[in-house]
Amino acid sequence: MDAETLSLSLELVSGSGPGLSAEQCAALRASLPLLHRDLRLRRLRLWGVVLGLRGDYVIARGWGGPDLLRGQLSFYSLNCVDWCLLPPATDAHIAQTQGIKGRFVGDPAHEYEYIVRNTAGGGDSALEEELTTHIKEEVRLTGTIAMIDREAAVAPRGAYIRNPLGQVIVNHSFRGLEVSEGKKLSSYFHFTPSLNPKKKSLLEKAALDPSIDFLDSLEHDIPRGSWSLQLEQGDSVLILRSLLWLGMTFYHVPLTPLHGHLYIGTGERNLDLPFMI
């Protein structure tokens, strides 16, 4: 959610469970504009909160360039006032993060210990070695945010366009989805570069607009039923919740450009989802 519409956006997702306290909201309204100005960012959004045992990580996302799918900067704060820059997420960070189980502690310097199994040699003489590896919680936080973005960050169809330079930018002509369109999962896209593009037939491609239909639709997600879509607050706001990453909530006010997503959760993937649907 954008820093400029923080109060309204928090009100729209208030029915999704834990939120931010009045003190946190007041601190964010004061600190986010300063972060935006000091780093000369083009855009700044509140990404969410990763809940820890001793402290919570408040996450903000900034962009220094026009492309909203590349060059993102992630920041975290333990008090909603002082912000620290997170290292860029890499495939190695994500792989390391997937090997760690349990809640976040709330201390960026905390070190986790996990075992990596390597196979040495080949054939009948192959030996499996167990290596103990350490990873800091700050790196785990980076990898977790990247995984949530890949699997649960959402944008409505038409809200962003790809220009002739290949940059993904805000579509200023977007006026919101109709209520009838907003009730369909096909009207929402994963707001992340496509990892496994779905092959489409010529008939399907003919019905698409390449400037706005360049992302993956939620209707093809596996397993089916991993999203909950409903109208709330007197049918005035569309709410889309991820059941894979509990705490990720997307909101959109129909017939207006107002939309966004917020994550407030423990940073753990819901591995029980296949047994719940």
From Swiss-Prot:
One of its GO terms (biological process) is axoneme assembly. One of its GO terms (cellular component) is radial spoke head. It comes from the Eukaryota. This is Radial spoke head protein 9 homolog. Belongs to the flagellar radial spoke RSP9 family. Keywords: Cell projection, Cilium, Cilium biogenesis/degradation, Cytoplasm, Cytoskeleton, Flagellum. Functions as part of axonemal radial spoke complexes that play an important part in the motility of sperm and cilia. Essential for both the radial spoke head assembly and the central pair microtubule stability in ependymal motile cilia. Required for motility of olfactory and neural cilia and for the structural integrity of ciliary axonemes in both 9+0 and 9+2 motile cilia. It is found in: Cytoplasm, Cytoskeleton, Cilium axoneme; Cytoplasm, Cytoskeleton, Flagellum axoneme; Cell projection, Kinocilium. Component of axonemal radial spoke complexes.
